Amino acid sequence: MVDVNDVIHANEKAQIDFAQMLLPEGIRRDNNKMYEEVEIPPNEPMPIGFEEKAVFVSELDEIGQLVFKGMKRLNRIQSIVFETAYNTNENLLICAPTGAGKTNIAMLTILHEIRQHLQPGGVIRKDQFKIVYVAPMKALAAEMTNYFSKRLEPLGIAVKELTGDMQLTKGEILRTQMLVTTPEKWDVVTRKSVGDVALSQVVRLLILDEVHLLHEDRGPVLESLVARTLRQVESTQSMIRILGLSATLPNYLDVATFLHVNPFIGLFYFDSRFRPVPLGQSFVGIKTTNKVQQLHDMEEVCYEKVLKQIKAGHQVMVFVHARNSTVRTAMSLIEMAKNRGELSFFQVDQGADYGQCEKQIQRSRNKQMREMFPDGFGIHHAGMLRQDRSLMESMFSRGYLKVLVCTATLAWGVNLPAHAVIIKGTNIYDAKRGTLVDLGILDVMQIFGRAGRPQFDKYGEGTIITTHDKLSHYLTLLTQQNPIESQFQQSLADNLNAEIALGTVTNVDEAVRWLSYTYLYVRMRANPLAYGINHKAYQMDPQLELYRKELVVESGRKLDKARMIRFDERTGYFASTDLGRTASHFYIKYNTIESFNELFNAQNTEADVLSIVSKAEEFEQIKVRVQEEDADGKSSVQILCGSHHTNAARIMRALFEMALRKRWPAMTYRLLNLCKVMDKRLWGWAHPLRQFNTLPASALARMEDKNLTIDKLRDMGKDEIGHMLHHVNIGLKVKQCVHQIPAILLESSIQPITRTVLRVRLSITPDFRWNDQVHGSVGEPWWLWVEDPINDHIYHSEYFLLQKKQVVSGEPQQVVFTIPIFEPMPSQYYIRAVSDRWLGSEAVCIINFQHLILPERHPPHTELLDLQPLPITALGNREYESLYKFTHYNPIQTQIFHTLYHTDTNVLLGAPTGSGKTIAAEMAIFRVFNMYPTSKVVYIAPLKALVRERIEDWKIRIEEKLGRKVVELTGDNTPDMRAIAQADLIVTTPEKWDGVSRSWQNRSYVQKVAILIIDEIHLLGEDRGPVLEVIVSRTNFISSHTSKTVRVVGLSTALANARDLADWLGIGQVGLFNFRPSVRPVPLEVHIQGFPGQHYCPRMATMNKPVFQAIRTHSPAKPVLIFVSSRRQTRLTALDLIAFLATEDDPKQWLHQDEREMTDIIATIRESNLKLTLAFGIGMHHAGLHERDRKTVEELFVNCKIQVLIATSTLAWGVNFPAHLVIVKGTEYYDGKTRRYVDYPITDVLQMMGRAGRPQFDDQGKAVILVHDIKKDFYKKFLYEPFPVESSLLSVLSDHLNAEIAAGTVTSKQDAMDYITWTYFFRRLVMNPSYYNLDDISHETINKYLSNLVERSLRDLECSYCMEIQQDEQTIEPLTYGRISSYYYLKHQTIRMFKERLKPELPVHELLAILSLPCSDYGTDTKTVLDNAIRICQAMLDVVANEGWLVSALSLCNLVQMIIQARWLHDSSLLTLPHIQKQELYVFRRWSSRGVRAGCGHQGPIEGLPELIAACDGKEDIFTSMVKEVLQPNQISQ
């Protein structure tokens, strides 16, 4: 075990142990009773080397000259470094004294980076890079931002400050090329996980100023930054150059190793001889130990030193360490000078504008300043007013002050040199440790850096006055004899947590590897004793693997105890928790989280919360002044919090997230309000209009006195408001502000899905006026949660953004989510929406459960009987048996065999994916072949891909081997009537069969159907469900008319409400088989992981590492299928996985094929990204791939040549190749119609999971589902218990009614009512009335509900010119447009749009505009558009013909031809030939018949197809000779 604290103390001891001290030559020592002084004279400057030559600005290229304008040449150090900094991409470490011009070296590297993105013509590609400059203090960051902004302005490079004081929006960051930030801020930014356009991904140059800070308390932040950057460079394989700038340090080689600097190229070390103004140093140690005497002696020595400089005619700065000491020291120096009669030395000669200065001083409110000025003394500290500080700076630089007494802030923030500086005393109070500590070496160096003014002085002088016991400490430090050590162990736990939350460290081994990138590791190997590692241990473990592991495990245990991570010591895996992520994102320390865990609970009041916040470790630096006489600093924090503190706002946000995650509604609400109180610096009880700074305070005070709430003000007129406030003109302004406070209206509706789950649809309508100056230009963020007031629990919460455009247009935003409900039923829940930024801006909506009717309980599943497996010989037909490769049916098939093969009853089979339902369908097909050989079988599959799969299989097995005709009927493939009439088996999609069977009276083959097999019938509940519903209803309707029964077989996954579906299909006890989800042939193990984050893309990016981990854990060598939502995600996921593989020992571990063979295959692939991923054994599969690429990928995966396949969700349905492990990466997809991310139907997720487990190879399958954390509970519930199927017919009822009216089956309103009673919708309406917005199920109510429904649908159709109601108000007459709509399978709204937009004489381009309207969502998917375009054009043609418009009709005929031939009307007809593009047409134009044997039909150049046909005269060799130079042989043969 390692105790970190012991190590830290050992570390400190080892650092101060200086037995042998080497001092430079020429020093002078003075030892008397009062003090000992060591004086080091200034160094001689370094002689100029033989090869050194100065670099002149005029020699630089154009960009360099622009930036260094006004400078003649670079100084000595800059010239030495120039070549490496300006012309290479090497990492650099520059150690040089303060004031040596390191900032310009940084500028050289910046210019090198900019030049790499310079395009011909002088354009800089600004979006391709970011430069980050990390400065140690905010004051310095501001100074650097100004400096770089001015210098880079000619190049148009934007420089912005990003610190705690200066926040930037996402847009500002994107528009900025250079960010100047502090270590802590950049740490926070890079801790947030990387999104798509992640900031850290485009950083190309990282500049770290003052790297010697590694020694200080803030060193660990720098270490974690560099480690994170270096690991990112390795994992993404993209270069980030690192430049370290530091003061001269002894162990510069260690720092160079840590920054990965090549010591022979990128390491430059300049000692004090390179200072622009040499520095003389003197160290004074006061001998007495009596504290009072010590102070007195220090002042005495200080006075002597000051007087000596003043007599020599120099100005002096005296640095002290507390604000009140500045005045005290100045007064005592004046006092001494008076007593000794030497005050005249300090007083300034009164020059010309002295009087002016005196006036300025006298105007100041600072009494001490006014009193001291005449004596030539000034003071300066951060507690003074800005103008007073500036006044002191200008007086000192103009020479009107001889002595300036100041604190160290002057040395850091302001560039104000003096000939001599004196540091009086080196004890400063450190609030964290609660004691006095030594002044940090960094401050000393910075202060000494102010000694000597470059233009005026030959040398500068720095004096440090300390106690005698500290004398040697400062001597060693300032003569650079102490190596700088790492402080990383102090905050190892916090930094480890940040890496785990980011996902870059997931187990102990990775954490050990991560530590090897830190400075701690470099120093532990160089100086093991200082870190508590003895000689023997170091010899046994020279790489310190074991020691690093001990450190990691101990930190892991600490974090696990604080519930910030879950640490499984057996496997060594780390998993981040919500608490750990919150701590990392809000930069909260481990100790603070521990105290929160102890103190924070749901019952805390506001006062308790403030008290908890004030106990945070972040506030230790707040000290209580003696005058305040309060022993406890914590109450001081509370008071300061009340007046505002940056840390408090951050910690408050973290507490808010914790409360939200713990699901405490009252606490969440309270904390969100406190967060806003901190941000706005307004108490919650103040009037909300105080958030506007445009209204006068008097008016606001009156509103508070008269209790004029926002609601009251909304209802009042502007004049009334003016009178109430005794200020007539202000009414309008107040009214405008009232309407700009964000307000929303909430409306909710609920649908019970089961007895325990409700779906809530929430409509959010903005109710305020947008003003860019008040609201910005993006949107207003809100928090939304559903709370149960009785149990004090949040059942659902989410963050949403009201976009500016939604507010301006007033369009409502729809949010859909599910919540649990418990019995006994509560009376109500509340939906609460609270603005994230505005006080007093919230809305509440009540969900009332009084009229809620929950659906019936579901009957039990079918038990799987313990039967002897049935051999396939039971089919009794040799031909059928020969189709199967197995000998016996599986248990499910055995149990259903008799019903399917020996009876004609309707069957509903509910069984998990992968249990052999297709073979069950074949049993029913064979029954028809046996019993009704002249009838037809129709097999309906929901997707074209499924139809294709069945066709490919059955064309061989049923058509070739059994001699039965199999026909495909889809949008892609419409055979002629004769083929359909002769077919025995028709495989089709729901829409196509619906379109065909609509006119069943005229199509004899529809009446010959003996069996309808519907695959995936549970899709009834999805968007395309209504079509299935209509098909079955129509089939029943047809068989009732033709008195010939049609058998219906439904295949589905396990269902919750199978009984309802069975009743509707007319199935009694015999035909219903609904097995449990658990009776899969291969058992399935499911893991569900939740991921936080409101935004989709960054959330997907955070899932990539867990995907990689899951593959390594569950399926290191077996096939893996990863499902994602879009083509883009297939690419991003694949590229990230390759990046993770790159860090492994064997990056091609997923490729199970000889690399040379794979190279040959890759050569045939068209898609560039796929070429890259296949080389690593990762395939991609989506609709955008070329057919041949897709086939290649499928073959490689099925034959286990590649191990991982990343596919879009359609593959789950379309292709049957299972894998050992299935990963569902995210359960939402982008829905173009509603323009937002919506959830996959649960059936899709089950289908994807169903692909896990290969029946012949695996004894169990694995599925890993990665979801948005707020949906985790929902998926937990429904992935294990089946999901009930509801009807979706309501939304599209009008279109289906129209089809029946056009077909003549519905001729009156009563027929329409009867038609509805045939549907599944009618069954479910009675079973789950609340789902369909029906309040009760009495006969009367249902009748009324249905007649309203019919009336509404018919009215819609009438408005669309599809039908008309006769005068008796009952009879319905179809119109031409209704028939067109039905025949071409178009929505009635589309036909209405055609009727209103088509005109007599429309040219083609306007027709295209009309055609594109219904398909605007398919901007990218040309294929989807083309599937529908011809059908829609033909419908338009019918509409135009019906109106008798010839010009438009001809235009449409041209348009259809253009679409089918894929060319414009005026293009050459030769383009209809495959593979011929415009650029290849020249081969035809230049052809002539000379040289070809006589008798050729065409002589000259060929312009079109008829000429080509004549020229070739049916001879292939003539055609080949024409095109052989532009086409490959295989292309010619096509």
Swiss-Prot record:
It comes from Danio rerio. InterPro entries: AAA+_ATPase, C2_domain_sf, DEAD/DEAH_box_helicase_dom, Hel308_SKI2-like, Helicase_ATP-bd, Helicase_C-like, P-loop_NTPase, Sec63-dom. GO terms for molecular function: 3'-5' DNA helicase activity; ATP binding; ATP hydrolysis activity; nucleic acid binding; RNA helicase activity. 3'-5' DNA helicase involved in repair of alkylated DNA. Promotes DNA unwinding to generate single-stranded substrate needed for alkbh3, enabling alkbh3 to process alkylated N3-methylcytosine (3mC) within double-stranded regions. Also involved in activation of the ribosome quality control (RQC) pathway, a pathway that degrades nascent peptide chains during problematic translation. Drives the splitting of stalled ribosomes. Belongs to the helicase family. One of its GO terms (cellular component) is nuclear speck. Keywords: ATP-binding, Cytoplasm, DNA damage, DNA repair, Helicase, Hydrolase, Isomerase, Nucleotide-binding, Nucleus, Repeat. A motif (DEIH box) lies at residues 1015-1018. ATP binds at residues 96-103, 911-918. GO terms for biological process: DNA alkylation repair; rescue of stalled ribosome; ribosome disassembly; ribosome-associated ubiquitin-dependent protein catabolic process. It catalyses: Couples ATP hydrolysis with the unwinding of duplex DNA by translocating in the 3'-5' direction; ATP + H2O = ADP + phosphate + H(+). The keyword Cytoplasm applies. Residues 294-500, 1106-1313 form the Helicase C-terminal domain. Residues 83-267, 898-1073 form the Helicase ATP-binding domain. This is Activating signal cointegrator 1 complex subunit 3. Its EC number is 5.6.2.4. It is found in: Nucleus; Nucleus speckle; Cytoplasm, Cytosol. Residues 576-849, 1374-1481 form the SEC63 domain. Transmembrane segments: none annotated. A motif (DEVH box) lies at residues 209-212.
